[in-house]
Amino acid sequence: SKVRNYTLYCMDRTQSDLLYRLYMEDSAIVPEHLRFHAVPVLNFEVRPLLESRMPLAIDFGSSNTTAGIYLDNTYFEGLNGDPITQILKRDQINYVPYLDVEHDDAETLILPTVAAVIGIDNGEIRYAFGHEANRLFHLSYIDEGFCVFYDLKRWVGDADRMEELVDRQGHRVFTPRRDIIKAYLEYVIGCARQRFKCNFSSLHISAPVKQKPLFIQLFREILPNYQLESENMLDEGVAVLYNTISEMIEGKRYKDGQLYQALIIDCGGGTTDLSSCRFRITDRRVAYKIDITTAYENGNTDFGGNNLTYRVMQLLKLTLARQLGGDDLPDPADLIRAFDVDVFRNVDQDGVDAVYASLDEAYARAEQILPTRFRDYEHSSRADYYAVKNNFYFLFEIAERVKKAFYSRTNILRMAISSLPLKENVTECLLVDRWKLSYRQDGQIQTLKDIPTAYINSYELNLLLRADIYGIVRQFIEGPYEKDELQDYAILRLTGQSCRIDIFREALKEFIPGKIIESSRRKGAGDQLHELKLICLNGAIKYLKDCKFGYADVQITHDQAAFPYVITAFTHTNEEKTLIHSLDRKNIRGFISRNMADLTLKLFLKDLEGRQRYVYNCSCDPQKFTSQQPEDIVAKYDGQIRQDDLDDIVDRELKFFVLADESRWGFTVVPVLRENGQLRLGPDQFFRFETEGWVTNFFDGTK
């Protein structure tokens, strides 16, 4: 155009949303006025997006997700004259920021792993993610239908399972979980594209060490337009370790060619895992040679940051229920005082469950006053169901805010949770929404205008969480401690945001010298709110940079994982036989025999404490068995089935071989029988160790 008279209109979020709806949704209502600032612009230029040479790295977490990329000079040359270059860091890691719409659009590097349904139009689903999803939930009324999903990462193990989606107008649709995960990840990629003004052809998405092949397969299927760095994809434990290795090289704090050993405890939002690593750094003429051997040592799929939040929620619910008419409920202060003992020794003697038995019993009784088990109300009225569901999410979110406030800032001694502003000495007031909590009065569920004020202090909170945290540390560390193996480790790295809590370090000192733990925590890390969450992402980006630019030749070897589960079955004499042993890399397969007439086998999954967690039913159809030579069976299962064990099968004997499968984090059952002297092989069946039938899910409506 010859006439260059341009104006840039700047407006707040409300006006922007209004204008967007007018343009996109054909609204019949046109406002009389719009408030905005007009800025004259001499000229503008529309540029195509750059093509990034570096992969976008994503740390897909149970509670929060982060993303980032390494930007070199070549990238900045393509952005010549773009104001974004004044914000981005040259030859450094750059993170994807997100707007926290609940806190005045403040920039944050953390995106909650949350998805909410905005609307369903002719089967088309519109989502909101992260902070926006949380904001919409907070804006909803108690009796409104709302659909929000947490803990998306846990869905990877059962990604084809259908979820029912409902919008506020009552429209319903079923969609597979993989589609929700895909939409969430595409949103993260879109935020990165917007930030860095470039398209990404390749991605690196870190995965848990125990389920890495499963994650890679799913990401390939749901993100087919991107090249997945599957060959160079680090699991979360190795990514954390590589960040440490990179810091050692940068600070010249390593001895050339020396073998180091490290333990990594990753306490995420939903699970906690223990990995071991051995690594050696050699400075060669053209690049560093880094050899890493890693192995999965232990894990607890039932423990993570959400467990600690749930403990705070238990205390909060009990405190509120007591003030709402539950006079027969025990005083929360008395329950907390009962924890003011040598709780570590109590856990050693009686276990974690025994320590919390009184609190769990009181919490169950509080359900009569302040209901949160919304699954029990699926056949009640719509209003009651959503009121109880809202109670759970409202209290759980308050508990999360309380936990974060105490452990991200060290100057809070006492906190009041109230829907009305309070000013008290040495007390921080956590303001919560009004008209959000419902309680049972005279058999009816009533909505409260304001919640009763609840108080909690840092001393009580530490007492409350000590047993849970020591229990998980003891589960991981006691075995190596008793075998005198801990002295071999020079580094112990704590990662995950929950590890900001000093109780982790206190519990570790029961087994490990504090100096080793200190060496794995960067000085001043307590001042960096998200540093522990970013360690995994930083390690992945540094690894990608070193590999892409040829700074390091990295060789990664994965040893056989140690399974934290036991698989057993009963013989015909009712004797229990262990088929897969826990934490024993040598005994990860076994077999048990039945008579040919009995083609059904029950298998029992137990945890490290010997508690039965799940029962598998394995049935065989004799019509599907085919004749096979023993050497062919041995070859088909890569030697996991020995020919001697096949030769031992007598006529009319059905032998079930149970083979651990690390790549899919489960086990395969292979039925073989001998009939009229001929071996016959039945179809094998795969079972996952971790299924929704027993894994704790805090958002399933049973808490």
Predicted regions: what they are:
Residues I181-Y184, T309-Q314, L318, A357-V554, ...:
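Helical "lid/coupling" subdomains associated with nucleotide-phosphate turnover
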Residues S1-L99, G145-Q261, R278-T301, G305, ...:
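N-terminal phosphate-binding loop and flanking beta/alpha elements of the actin-like ATPase fold
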Residues S1-R13, K89-L203, A207, Q217, ...:
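Phosphate-binding loop and its immediate beta->loop->alpha context
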Residues T65-I69, T113-V117, T272-C277:
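Short beta-strand scaffold segments in enzyme catalytic cores
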Residues S1-S27, L324-N346, E518-D647, D651:
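Acidic, glycine/GT-rich loop-and beta-edge segments that sit at the periphery of enzyme/chaperone cores
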Residues S1-D17, E25-H37, R47, R474-Y481, ...:
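Terminal low-complexity/disordered tails
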Residues G61, C267-T271, A561:
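Short flexible coil/turn linkers enriched for glycine and charged/polar residues
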Residues L263-C277, F549-A552:
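Metal-dependent DNA phosphodiester-chemistry modules and their immediately adjacent helices/loops
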